[in-house]
């Protein structure tokens, strides 16, 4: 009975916007679907040869897919699949922690600039509190969560202060290497989404999702690795490999 209720509620929520800034069905050109033999993750194209995602992603037999809106549809057009050469975890990442939760993927070939594949800009400064950001990832249909996600969605939410974030997540150490994006308090609606969603503010990548108690597509507060604070590692890794 509970499962049937969640299925009906999920269908209704997918029909109507979760908030006035909800968008569905369009793939941001920097967004990458990371398909594997485990759970998928969301990635971001930051260079024609490089994708960034969260280090907590487990990606055996990885496929890097660009331009996809519905991973459950094998007939979707304008999809580009790329092999990868090597994966680089941040050297300080620990599975038991949400700190330093970043991973770089070097592709085997350069991705050509197109309408559905374009590298996002990296930040030159820290993102400000109250900045408006777009958070994008794929959602599952709660009527059958055993299938691939079938709905690409974007929600527009704001960066919150460290104080607000620490109040929302008292059990976590919210460091200067993190940003938090979302609405306090969260909505806690039933949901299942692909992890490692990016926070892109004014066309610039500022965060990669490490953790959320709920779903970021429901505007729940997410804790993100702050891309600005990891630029030295990102740039050194790309330069030396």
Curated annotation (Swiss-Prot):
Catalysed reaction equations from the record: Preferential cleavage: Arg-|-Xaa, Lys-|-Xaa
E.C. number(s) listed in UniProt: 3.4.21.4
Active site residues per record: 56 (charge relay system), 101 (charge relay system)
MF terms in GO: serine-type endopeptidase activity
Cellular component terms per the entry's GO annotation: extracellular region
Cysteines paired by S-S bonds: 41-57, 133-201, 165-180, 191-215
GO annotation terms (biological process): proteolysis
Domain Peptidase S1 span(s) in chain numbering: 18-239
Record keywords, A-Z: Disulfide bond, Glycoprotein, Hydrolase, Protease, Secreted, Serine protease, Signal
Coiled coil: none
Record protein name field: Putative inactive serine protease 58
Organism (species): Mus musculus (Mouse)
